[in-house]
Amino acid sequence: KLEHFGMAEPGDCRLVFTAGAEELAAAVAQVQAEPDAPQEEDGLLTEAVNRTILGGFSALYEQLVQEYHVVPVTDPDFELLAVNRAEGFRAGAQFYALPPLEVGAYTGFVQPIEPHPIRQLTIELEINRHHGDEERAADAAGKAALRQQVAREIWAQRCAQAEQRARKELVWQLGDAVKGPLPKQLVGGNYFAEQRQFNLSLQANGINFDQFLKVRGQTVEEFRAWLHAQAERKLRSWLGLLLVAEKEGLAPTDAEVEAAAAHWDAKLDGERTFPANDARKVRQRLARERAEQFIVGLYPHAAAR
């Protein structure tokens, strides 16, 4: 049962809801019937609350979406506020919804495709790793032909990688055209996620952060400001894709959403939660994918389909 709903700022949705003693008791009985049920009271009640939320929150979620005309864009985070067997429990939830944004022009973006040049060392390393026997058995002409073949393969790979980078950048350019306020906590969370991704990239490539800054000619403060701007730009692009999908009629049908949800992929949609939110995640992913294709010119206008 909904007790309160409001927004700390546009798009930052907070609510408090309750469940009665009967609902809690039914969930407790379900948990206790399982062989690995928690023995301690706190653990038992916590598991029962989680079961109740996952089983009953979906209807309340749909009610919120319809009554308050919000478009959630993140999974809700739950917080248990109070619980006892005599009264049930009281819990809070927070999620982010599409804030009041406007998108300007979202076609006509231009981004050069710039493959990284190939060094001779790269060719030699590739031959040593994958063509060693072939290279040792070849004569001079064969060795030269092998190097040309490997160079062509590496170049084709780098061209494909460069095209992928250019497509991503085209989509990120959309972020520059999306205007309006963003929830501060959503921006902050996106920045920290971008920072984690950057740190993992440095580690994977064996690059020292100080060396990285030296090559870029930036101070720590300048880099952080740049990374923050990049994170917000990507967030605006991510939200802007939903606006483009709506404007161009690219939303998937219910049947398409159901078909995609039936073959759930955690890498694409994250962990399953509850039915209404899971459908929302799949629907928005499909819409964003189509909007991305539309922006880079690979998806037809809705009127042409």
Question: In which residue ranges do the predicted regions lie?
Answer:
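FKBP-type peptidyl-prolyl cis-trans isomerases
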Residues: 1-305
